[in-house]
């Protein structure tokens, strides 16, 4: 019993450190065997007579039961120590998890600050940065465009620098609407007059008159002249 009490003493000290309360002195004495379990009634109970041997046996039995109760108390304390260790382990895990979460959040915020956008934008940017192996047409167009860009300046150098091109004149802005209408009518009449020019047969020296236009050609020419004149009238009316 004394060896058991001595082996249980370190656990009790650990319990005192975990719980923060001192172990009762009566429990310590019962574990260390400081109380003598004598056989004489005088030692166990000084006021008792020597003839009360049966009463001494009862007192010794009570003290044995008290020692057993103390041992049970020790077991309860050991269970409390085990429970306390489990609680400490769970608290340590929660603290570590909180530390990891804060560290991950700081890393994520720094990543967002570097990308300068929202999480969806950063994910989209990382997805767009991946090479697209399926879009071969787009890669071909890019390669063809770069090839043309490299070939075009070389051909221009070989051909030489072209002279200054004549600026195109917007006659619609220079000529007023009335003069433009007259110009268009003159152009129409010039076209009609060119049809009446003389022409020569390829084997003969005879001068012949122009072939008479058919009814369809004359109707078409008249329609074109009427269309030009109608358009000129619309322009004048608009002005």
Swiss-Prot record:
The keyword Phosphoprotein applies. Its main location: cytoplasm. Keywords: Cytoplasm, Leucine-rich repeat, Phosphoprotein, Repeat. It is found in: Cytoplasm. The modification Phosphoserine is found at residues 118, 126, 129. GO terms for biological process: actomyosin structure organization; cell migration; positive regulation of canonical NF-kappaB signal transduction; positive regulation of cytokine production. GO terms for cellular component: actomyosin; cytoplasm. LRR repeats lie at residues 55-83, 93-114. It comes from the Eukaryota. The keyword Repeat applies. Residues 107-140 are annotated as: Disordered. InterPro entries: LURA1/LRA25, LURAP1. It holds the Pfam family LURAP. Phosphorylated. Residues 107-118 have a biased composition (Low complexity). Acts as an activator of the canonical NF-kappa-B pathway and drive the production of pro-inflammatory cytokines. Promotes the antigen (Ag)-presenting and priming function of dendritic cells via the canonical NF-kappa-B pathway. In concert with MYO18A and CDC42BPA/CDC42BPB, is involved in modulating lamellar actomyosin retrograde flow that is crucial to cell protrusion and migration. Activates CDC42BPA/CDC42BPB and targets it to actomyosin through its interaction with MYO18A, leading to MYL9/MLC2 phosphorylation and MYH9/MYH10-dependent actomyosin assembly in the lamella. Forms a tripartite complex with CDC42BPA/CDC42BPB and MYO18A acting as an adapter connecting both. Its binding to CDC42BPA/CDC42BPB results in their activation by abolition of their negative autoregulation. Interacts with CDC42BPA and CDC42BPB. PANTHER family: LEUCINE RICH ADAPTOR PROTEIN 1 (PTHR33767:SF2), LEUCINE RICH ADAPTOR PROTEIN 1-LIKE (PTHR33767). This is Leucine rich adaptor protein 1. The lineage of its organism: Eukaryota, Metazoa, Chordata, Craniata, Vertebrata.
């Amino acid at each position: 019993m004394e060896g058991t009490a001595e082996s249980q003493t370190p656990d009790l000290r650990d319990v005192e450190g975990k719980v923060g309360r001192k172990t009762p002195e009566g429990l310590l004495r019962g574990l260390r065997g400081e109380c003598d379990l004598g056989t004489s009634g005088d030692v166990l109970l000084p006021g008792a007579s020597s003839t009360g041997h049966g009463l001494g046996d009862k007192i010794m039995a009570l003290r044995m039961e008290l020692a057993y109760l103390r041992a049970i108390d020790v077991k309860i304390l050991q269970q409390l120590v085990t429970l306390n260790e489990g609680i400490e382990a769970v608290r340590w895990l929660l603290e570590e998890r909180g530390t990891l979460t804060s560290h991950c959040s700081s890393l994520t915020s720094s990543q967002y600050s570097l990308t300068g956008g929202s999480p969806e934008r950063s994910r989209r940017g990382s997805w767009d940065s991946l090479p697209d192996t399926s879009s071969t047409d787009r890669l071909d167009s890019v390669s063809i465009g770069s090839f043309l860009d490299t070939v075009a300046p070389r051909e221009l150098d070989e051909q030489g620098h072209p002279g200054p091109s004549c600026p195109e004149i917007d006659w619609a802005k220079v000529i007023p609407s009335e003069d433009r209408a007259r110009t268009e009518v003159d152009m129409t009449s010039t076209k009609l007059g060119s049809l009446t020019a003389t022409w020569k047969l390829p084997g003969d020296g005879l001068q012949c008159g122009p072939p008479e236009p058919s009814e369809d050609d004359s109707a078409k020419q008249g329609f074109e002249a009427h269309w030009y004149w109608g358009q000129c009238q619309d322009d004048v009316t608009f002005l």
